[in-house]
């Protein structure tokens, strides 16, 4: 890709204080986009935005809960105030919350639904309204997961939200396409992030053994797919989910979680 392919574009990226979200925000900024970088952790948001600015990118930190309508509307307003428009939105923020189905706490269920589904829906709605008003199209990207396609132990609530996001994208094709707005999702497989490595030090070994490509993804792998779907090269692609899993869903072996402690 041309290193300045996103010049003149403006993106909101949620859950971007670290991991996949940060990598997407960083790559967009490196290629010319202005960024509103969101994270619920104010310190992470500020640090991530500073790293991007130190590398020559335009980036504004916007801390807050990305499932809160006031925060979402504030991010859209900030994009318009600081950059004059909003052309891309990446609903990356999400939580996992493993748990035994029979004992899964209702408060965990509500939180997963609120952050993963409601937050993504509300960001999509607010961003699309702004894009419709601008009359110049736009790109919306949802962060799904391979567990929205394939069963996995202890992830019933999480998997439900990810499958729901993909169906949201398909349905919104009918309402967004007349305005030149595309909406797609990326479905990462096992990915090395600060969170996955902290939760399970054996994560790289476990997933390398059962991934056909011989390794889990790194954040750059997911960001590269995201940038394609946000770029001009994907202008006739909408309502689709791009799986980035090193071939895992082709064979779908499950990791051994027999020793995993779940609540």
At which residue positions do the language-model features occur?
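Active-site helix of classical SDR
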Residues: 124, 161, 169
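Residue(s) in the substrate-gating loop at a strand-loop-helix junction
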Residues: 145
């Amino acid at each position: 890709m041309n290193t300045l392919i996103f010049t003149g574009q403006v993106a909101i990226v949620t859950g971007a204080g670290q991991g996949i979200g940060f990598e997407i925000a960083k790559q967009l900024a490196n290629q010319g986009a202005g960024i509103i970088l969101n994270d619920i952790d104010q310190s992470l948001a500020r640090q991530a935005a500073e790293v991007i600015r130190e590398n020559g990118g335009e980036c504004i930190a916007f801390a807050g809960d990305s499932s809160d309508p006031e925060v979402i509307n504030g991010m859209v307003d900030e994009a318009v105030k600081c950059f004059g428009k909003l052309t891309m939105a990446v609903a990356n923020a999400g939580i996992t919350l493993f748990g035994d189905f029979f004992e899964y706490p209702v408060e965990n269920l509500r939180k997963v639904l609120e952050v993963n589904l409601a937050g993504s829906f509300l960001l999509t709605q607010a961003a699309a309204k702004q894009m419709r008003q601008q009359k110049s199209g736009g790109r919306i990207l949802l962060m799904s997961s391979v567990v929205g396609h394939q069963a996995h132990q202890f992830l019933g609530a999480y998997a439900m939200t990810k499958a729901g996001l993909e169906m949201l994208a398909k349905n919104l094709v009918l309402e967004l396409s007349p305005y030149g707005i595309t909406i797609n999702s990326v479905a990462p497989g096992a990915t090395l992030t600060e969170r996955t490595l902290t939760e399970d030090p054996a994560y790289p070994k476990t997933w390398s053994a059962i991934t056909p490509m011989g390794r889990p993804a790194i954040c750059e792998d997911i960001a590269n797919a995201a940038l394609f779907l946000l770029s001009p090269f994907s202008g006739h692609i909408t309502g689709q989910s791009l799986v980035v899993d090193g071939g895992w869903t082709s064979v779908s072996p499950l990791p051994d979680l027999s020793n995993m402690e779940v609540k």
